[in-house]
Amino acid sequence: MFDAMYKTASFENFKPARFLSQGSIEINGAQVPYETICEDNVFYNNVGKPIASIFSYSYIRTDVKDRNNRPVIFGFNGGPGTSSMMVHVGFLGTKRLKYTDDCNQPSTLPPYEVIDNFNCLLDVADIVVVDPVATGYGLLLDAECADQFLAIEPDAEALLTFISCWLTKYSRWMSPKYLLGESYGCIRSAVAAGIASGGGKKRAYSMAFDGLILIGNSITTGRYFNQDIPTELSVLAFPTAAAINWYHHHPTQQPLETFVQEARAFAERDYLLALFRGNDLPQEEYVDIRRRTAFYTGISEAYLDEHLLRFQEEDIVTQILREKGEHLSRYDGRITLPRFTSQMGSNFSTVKDDPATAKYGPYFHAALCGEVFPALNIHLERDFVPSASLHGDRFVRETYDRLSGQQLSSAMRRCPGMRVFFASGWYDVCTQIGMAYYLANHAYLPKDRTFIKGYPSGHMLYIGEENIKALNDDIRTFLKGENPNSKP
């Protein structure tokens, strides 16, 4: 089934593709000329047979003489098994979606509007967008070689091999180098940075990155995402639940961030202590904690009572608007759909049945294939795979070496100049900002080189004209070596 469903080329007839184009775009009032190189980056076995390909989309500014001081950003999404579609057409490329002020727009049906990305980072950095093996236009040509790519460390090592070859091919080893990952792409970035400076299973890479830009952080001190984190997960989820409750119910007149930080302070002190005390908590204190938890999160006291004050990620999705008969999006808690019922199937999935995925997936896919690829002169008779859910079964989530949080901490220890910027959406239930706070504190990341910032958005936090401007301006600040939080 893997061959038939997810492989649109075989090694017998595979020919590496390469497409070139040129363009110019106005960014911050100035014209920026550039060239693009979109191509297969092929992996071969010991007898020269192609077994896989990473597909890359390189945007290179052409009027720059000193490339040694010009940063290169390598950007990708997550999954694992997800193509670069979201970050590519969302905010990194020279063309992007036109956003509206209403997060519940656009319609899921065409026509869709694509515009020049006047927020693009190409004025300050060259950009390489990456489709990993078996995602997007990336290919797994030999299914028997899946274990060389579809696992945490092999995936990261494949990325490093590609980056090493790209830097050599385009003479950019002396340039500042940044990894930009979204969602699982954050784990990929952390593991790649750790292996780059410390070595992989069979080889060294001897590479250092100037910084990591982590959008929708998935790195934790646990095994995989939030597995085996030695703390109460509802405490980490508290800021996200509070933000979504603020958006839908407006329990106070406080600004969003003021309310969320107040909720976080309650969660990390009174709420956490109450959970720790359990049945030893006096009834009067229990009732007070239950009331305040319901006030901040929007989850009913009755539900909290039934679950001993705790709530999970799925409870944020299903309980905050339960009285309205609506489900929230796991990827953007502002977006809703009518409540899932048994008539729709027996198994509710917070991924497949997600309101934001249903809304934005068709928009991004059509814009990328219908507008962006033709502009890049890409003409390829190959199926573009936005996300390969098969990886959920085939992708090995266990590490043979260090956990993702340990890899990041080790990389920052070995590379004293490496800096990390966590950018998170307040309304993102999938990768909650509380996880980033906890990671920074419990992986003991250097405080002077670690920056965390929340945005009034969801998992794809660049959605919205104000959000994409804020994010890209903050990335520009980060690339200058400054603190993104220093901006108002």
Indicate where each model-derived feature is located.
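Catalytic histidine neighborhood in serine/cysteine hydrolases
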Residues: 444-460
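Alpha/beta-hydrolase active-site loop
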Residues: 121-125, 132, 149-169
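Alpha/beta-hydrolase fold catalytic core
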Residues: 280-430
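Alpha/beta-hydrolase fold nucleophile elbow
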Residues: 172-184
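A catalytic-pocket lid/entrance helix-loop region that shapes and gates access to the active site
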Residues: 95-99, 193, 197-297
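Catalytic histidine-centered segment of alpha/beta-hydrolase-like enzymes
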Residues: 458-468
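N-terminal cap/lid subdomain of alpha/beta-hydrolase-fold enzymes
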Residues: 3-6, 48-148
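Short alpha-helix in the alpha/beta-hydrolase fold that links the catalytic acid
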Residues: 418, 432-442
